[in-house]
Amino acid sequence: MKKFLVVALMLVASAAFVYTGYAGESLKSGPQIGEKARPQPFFPLNINGPTPNEKQCLVCRNGDNPVAMIFAREPNENLVMLIKKLDAETVKNSEKKMGSFCVFCNDSEGLSTKLADLAKNESLKKFTLAIDNPTGPAPYNISKDADITVVLYTKSKVVANYTFKKGEFKAADVEKIVSDVSKIVK
């Protein structure tokens, strides 16, 4: 009986260890810190910016410049707040040729009109909104579980990556991301 109890406790302990390992893993989406930020060109439909209603490679357009790149499923209040603040940062850092854009991985009808209205209503100056397929560009590894993926990069290397599941993105996250723009515009 003693032997059985010891074996049972060991099994429970090892099961708990395995479970904690999986539960503690964070969601990965998009290029990770230290990786190449632009694994391959892709051509989303730009809604605003220099080439509205045209497909253009935004990572190509920005080259090695500092960039805030977002992949999102749909607009929400905190995402719009982030977009507005990153637009202001992009304007402020125009001498460093900072670029910023959000690619919506979504094919729902009416999204282009909704995003055009967003760009107009928020008076976006330098921030480009674009649409791509629901899975996102394949080499960028956008997780199907990620609602919002933010990648800050410069010289084509990722400096910061933030990934959020649906409902997890909060106002405090907006402030953290905006403060980390300083890492790419040094």
Language-model regions: role of each:
Residues 76-91, 112-114, 118:
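Typically the conserved alpha-helix immediately C-terminal to a functionally engaged Cys/Sec
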Residues 62, 134-174:
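Thiol/disulfide oxidoreductase modules built on the thioredoxin-like
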Residues 19-44:
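N-proximal helix/coil linker or "cap" segments that precede and/or mark the start of modular domains
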Residues 8-16:
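Bacterial N-terminal signal peptides
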